[in-house]
Amino acid sequence: MTCLDPKTIWPNEAVPNVRYRDFSKMVLFTAGDEDQFERKRSYKNGTNPDKKVSLDGNIWTNLFVPNEGLETEFWNGYNLNASSTINTFDYMFNKFKKGIFVKIVDNKVVTFLPFSKHGYKNDWGDLMKYDPSKYKSMIDFMRHVSNQTAIANNKNYKFKPDQVSRYTNQWYSNNCLIRYEHPLSEGDTNVVTLRHMFDELCATREVPDIELFINRRDFPLLTKNGTEPYYNIFGKDHSLDSKSLKLISEGMCPILSMCTSDMYADIVIPTHEDWARVASTEGVKTHVGDKENNENSLPKKITFPPQCKDYSKDNFNTPWEKRIPTAVFRGGSTGCGVSSDTNLETFNQRLVAAKISYNSKPDKYNVPLITAGITKWNLRPRKILNEKYLQTINIEKEAPKVSPLTPEEQSKYKYIINIDGHVSAFRLSLEMSMGCCILLVKSKIPNETFGWKMWFSHLLKPYIHYVPVKSDLSDLIEKIQWCRDNDEKCKEISQEALKFYQTYLSRESILDYMQNLMVKLKLSFPTNEIVYGTDPLFIQNSVQSKYLFNMMNNSINPIFPFLTPYLIPKPIPIYNILGTSLRGSYGWSKGYSMFLKHMFKPTIPKEKDNLKENANQNERKLNEKLNEESRVFTENQQENDWEMKRSTINLKGVFEKRLFENKKSTVDLYSISGSNVVKKSTSDAQGMIEHINEAFISDTCINNLLKIIPNFAWSFAFEKSLNENGVEQCTLLNEYIEGETFSTSIKNKMSYLGFSSGKPFKNVLEVLFQIILSIQFAQEQCGFIHNDLTPWNIIIQTLKEPITIQYPLFSGIYKIITKHVPVIIDYGKSHVATSPYGDFCFNELSVGNVIHYGVVNMFNMIECQDVFSIILYSCLDMLTVNGTKFSQRENDETEYDEQSIIKMLNFFSPTELKTRKEALSFIYQYKKYENLIKAHETINLEKSPIEFIKYFTSIFKKEKVVYGLSRLDSKRTGLIMDFNNPKQIFDEAFAQNIQEVYISFLNVPQNLYKCTLPQPKTKIELYMVAQLLIKCLKDTLKDYRIFAEKSSLRKESFHNDIIKFENAINFITTFYSKEISKHGNDSWVIPELCENNQIEISRNYFRTTSDTLNYSIKPCTDLTFFKKTILNILNWTDDEGLFEIKAEDRVEISTQLKFVLESTFKDKKISANNNTYIVYKKYCNKKYCI
């Protein structure tokens, strides 16, 4: 007999979850967080979701009555739309920790996904109490349980206090049975068996498309009346929490359990024991080693890991007359009770049976009436209904343990007692095949009319299939004696039970039952089909990919062929860094980016069949470009004499070193034309989504921020191709930032070059303030949220001399004087609100169509998410550096002040933290990424980043960080960030000689006369265009002066060229001054709003084929662009005062455009057919948002 090998049958599912080490024992991949669940489950639609399935020949068609007496066969709170799937996962995952999601499409199991919440926290921990009259502490009680278990089972257990979780809200339960181990031992026993049962169902029966959940607990999970299902913990008729009630009210996906009762909505299915039994006794058709399985193939017998139990070995053929007239029971001490005393509410039916057997005497022939006993003690703590304290079995008061008996040995008795354990004893179906007369003990649960039921229980009839026994077993001896007195009747009952087994508990019957269940579920609800729209994450990804592809193909085409040697001018530094690297200015970076995009521009295949080959060629071309010997111009000159000579140099093979590598991703450092570039490549599906998102966000948002502030890294170019193995991959070329990570700096107590010695906390604040100000600026400019802002995603660059960085926020201009510049990297998980069509409203597609893009929390803009993240991890690093000793000395500036750290955390904590232990507990509560990104659900993160700085400076008077509010200084800003004209840089890159470099500068003013100047109709737009053109000309003129000085240009030519630039500036000044004068009496208004505003729907899981989205809400006009434009215009300064806004105009603008300047973020939601569609956030104002 073959024991099934999951790795062979389901190679893509039988893989470890590398994210969680304690999931190592799982045979099938088990999702440990919501992100993994969403990624692993299928969103595939069936080809015929409305197909009708015939039940002709199905023996369960007229027998299936899961909710006898109700109008419908199923609880009416169930639904089959996809929002119900989300609700049910939320309910099971967060409240009960475990479950399995099953999705069947086109008669195949496309998703079988176990899940178990890592970092689970319950809502009943405060109800777990020990008896203080017996035990000193909870640990003392657990020590007692451990010692008793060791004695009872003859084991040499050694109690270890650190293996008990000290936090009761981290325990989990199976109704009354409590698990408290630390760390929790995760497992997936019997999951493989259930996986195979569903595969066999789809292979041998026609079933509809459907989504379901399987309960992995013994106890059912969902009551029909909205009360807590775990009544032993909460008490009888205790209402569910408000969140659970809300989820249930919105609709639940069917939950399949192996046991239920009339008080529960769970739908019963055959147990894993049922399927394991028939697979080994009757055989199955799927996964048995045959290449093909069909209806005519013979079933083959298999077993399932980890036990690989073979039920076919048992021989139940002992004739009735030769069986012993004794009632037998063997089993563990499972169940909620802890005593054999039936006078107590805490009695345990199995302990009662064992005590009855222990005290009973044999008959006159020395044949016992009963042989019942416990074979293994389960002393796990119980929380029992109406009991205040946790309980466990006192083995000294119970009958002693007895030797086990195999099923075959038990079948030699005439009568067999079936007693519930935690719920119904799953062995009942096996016992019905043994030829014994079953004594079935009634369930002991709060209301005896609600007995535990399995999938076939409603077909069983007393004195036909079994002999009933009262729940307290008070008539057990009487019933055994009745059996002896009615031997023929009991023989008949045993034979009827066997017939029932052969008819209804066979392999064919199990599959018929499951088919009948699927079909009737599908027909029982008004929404009987699930048709997924395309996941907006992939819609977004395709939009971003198209944008990036167009940007690559629309890059400027130079005159010269590709193999022409290039001249990339050396970066004009924005500041001098301690080290070997230079950071290029905004203009240089823009031009360098254009150069790289042209180099790696993909070619469009003429034929579809050539796509793969073309992608391979692109990949080879990319590597060739990165690794070829680059031909560049070098300088060979005397002082003040620049003679450009062509020469060829080898850039060390271009490849410098590998920075990072795993199975699916690499990060390499390259040198391209003398500049360091980071090449990031990945073939992982989620990694590619994040790479595309990073490239898109950089191009539409981050790179533009570098005009003003230096706290972000530039992304130059993007490529999507196939690697050498034919696997699709994405490649990013990003700016290389030299320095150490913020995390390393903190751990080194900020002792890196240039930091103030002995003042680590002050130095941390200096960095944090810059990070927070840059995040605030990025949010205001383009709705940027990093979503993974940690100290290791920030590089600290230390400068030779201090610089002043200005952050022009909506609330004012903040200045920081510093030698330490934090640069934020890695935007794969980030979010922006941007338009892929450009920055300026020169076409109707720009303004009002700002859409939210992102991978994490796609449709949520959580303003303080990044601040919370960086503060949380920075505090953890600081506390870790300090070690376990608490810093008591107030003036000890060589250590991180822990009281200050705690105060930082109190900005977020809903309850005041006072001690190091409380601070660490708060940090570890959110430290895991899946908890971090959901933190907004439990704490207030709707504050703006700047509020943290205001909070911190108000309580930390002694920590003086040099920053303040002022008017924007354009001169200082220009010296830090603004140099060059990107078009001129690009032209210079492809210049063949110094003459062409020279021409690239002169083309800037000359091209001005060849173009049609924009002539907008509002004063706001006129000022914006004029300021931008003046800035472009003056920045290029500054760069030209540097070039002229280095190239020793003739003075006459130099002066003539300066005149050309000045004439162009005068031309722009005259032209726009007249245009502004024409509109001098006009009001200050924003341009006419675009009519074709979009509404982006969130993850569109919820549409069915018949569903149409009807909404009466009008699109919300986005005011982000206008707000930024107005503030930029107001903050504009010029050496000559050109186009500066006058004081009286400032007053008018602040009054007439107040609604724009005061616009805030706002959510909008739409509902259709009970399905919630989330509209993206945008800047709104009542005047423009209805």
UniProtKB/Swiss-Prot annotation:
| Pfam families linked to this entry | Glyco_transf_90
Query: Which molecular function terms from Gene Ontology are attached?
Result: protein kinase activity
What name does this protein carry?
Uncharacterized protein 179R
